[in-house]
Amino acid sequence: MMLGITELTYTALIAFLIVIIIGPIFIPMLRKFKFGQTVRDDGPQTHLAKNGTPTMGGIIMIVAILITGLTRVKVSHDMAVGLICIAGFGFIGFLDDFIKIKLKRSLGLKAYQKIILQVALSFYVAFYQYTSSSSASQLMIPFTDFVINVGILYIPIMMFIIVAIVNAVNLTDGLDGLASGVTLIVSVFFMLFASSIAGNTEVAVLAAATVGACLGFLGFNSYPARVFMGDTGSMALGGAVVAFSVLTNSVLIIPIIGGIYFAEALSVLIQVGYFKATRKRFFKMAPIHHHFEQCGWPETRVVFIFWIITVVLAWISIIAVF
């Protein structure tokens, strides 16, 4: 049975309330057990004042989304895949955060370790979806009524896209309220899309829960942040975006609705490639949100403008699929 906007609003409200109830209890615990963010010296100098801010606050959002998802609808295939994406990628992020903070390894998981875990989970999600849904390999093409059937190539294509999305969302989490605000808007789009065009109640519920969780978390994470989501939260949100798009066969809309994620990841690739080729930097700093900071923009201005851009991209995405 499809849920209307009223029921989805209730769903978002439940997740929101869970976050704002748990937050004031959990954040002091993070501070007590010294789960504080270590700000790197090679980042923007204005961020040094954030050193020691509690991190791994993404756990709050994960708990809220899981509880809401499990209680609002009967759990079947799509809800199970969605929760696995969120909890699974969130757990990889948790390992990364824990190693950084408690084992004092500044970069967390080694790059190959992180990629192996992400690829393994993405293979599970892609393979499970391909073998469980007869329409999984039919990808919707934005701005048209056509779909493209990629057949068995669905698995490697989805693996690449899943890993790319998760890491792009992770890169977006560099300013107070940026990743949570952008993902809130992205989740609103998928909530509307899943509940109307795609006809997928479970994805609509997951998206609504993510809307509520992100909105509640913004109360603690907006500038000046009382807590950071950490890789725990950013990878979990990446897993949520993966679930929304994969389960509605709409991954090709991600470069539009997720344009900020795409720009953040692309800026890093350009910076690294350009530096290797010329020994010079293309941007003043990457990801691109730091470039604008280095240009003199206040952090709050960068975040607000990126939110506005995402709202515009959401409107364009609505035109593309409705």
From Swiss-Prot:
UniProt xrefs under Pfam families: Glycos_transf_4, MraY_sig1
* InterPro entries (UniProt xref): Glycosyl_transferase_4 (IPR000715), PNAcMuramoyl-5peptid_Trfase (IPR003524), PNAcMuramoyl-5peptid_Trfase_CS (IPR018480)
Q: In which pathway does it act?
A: Cell wall biogenesis; peptidoglycan biosynthesis
* Lipid metabolism recorded as keyword: no
Set out the biological process GO terms recorded for this chain's protein: cell division; cell wall organization; peptidoglycan biosynthetic process; regulation of cell shape
Known catalytic reactions: UDP-N-acetyl-alpha-D-muramoyl-L-alanyl-gamma-D-glutamyl-meso-2,6-diaminopimeloyl-D-alanyl-D-alanine + di-trans,octa-cis-undecaprenyl phosphate = di-trans,octa-cis-undecaprenyl diphospho-N-acetyl-alpha-D-muramoyl-L-alanyl-D-glutamyl-meso-2,6-diaminopimeloyl-D-alanyl-D-alanine + UMP
Compartment(s) of residence: Cell membrane
Bilayer-spanning residue ranges = 10-30, 51-71, 79-99, 107-127, 146-166, 178-198, 203-223, 227-247, 250-270, 302-322
Tell me which cofactor or cofactors this protein depends on: Mg(2+)
GO MF terms held by the record:
metal ion binding; phospho-N-acetylmuramoyl-pentapeptide-transferase activity; UDP-N-acetylmuramoyl-L-alanyl-D-glutamyl-meso-2,6-diaminopimelyl-D-alanyl-D-alanine:undecaprenyl-phosphate transferase activity
**Enzyme class label:** transferase
Does the keyword RNA-binding feature in the UniProt annotation?
Answer: no
**Which membrane topology term applies here?**
Multi-pass membrane protein
The record's Gene Ontology cellular component field reads: plasma membrane
Q: Name the predominant localization.
A: membrane
Q: Which domain of life is it from?
A: Bacteria
Per the UniProt record, which EC number(s) apply here? Answer: 2.7.8.13
Q: Which UniProt keywords apply?
A: Cell cycle, Cell division, Cell membrane, Cell shape, Cell wall biogenesis/degradation, Magnesium, Membrane, Metal-binding, Peptidoglycan synthesis, Transferase, Transmembrane, Transmembrane helix
Family of this protein = Belongs to the glycosyltransferase 4 family. MraY subfamily.
Its annotated function is as follows:
Catalyzes the initial step of the lipid cycle reactions in the biosynthesis of the cell wall peptidoglycan: transfers peptidoglycan precursor phospho-MurNAc-pentapeptide from UDP-MurNAc-pentapeptide onto the lipid carrier undecaprenyl phosphate, yielding undecaprenyl-pyrophosphoryl-MurNAc-pentapeptide, known as lipid I.
In Swiss-Prot or TrEMBL terms, this protein is called: Phospho-N-acetylmuramoyl-pentapeptide-transferase
Query: What is the species listed in this Swiss-Prot or TrEMBL entry?
Result: Clostridioides difficile (strain 630)
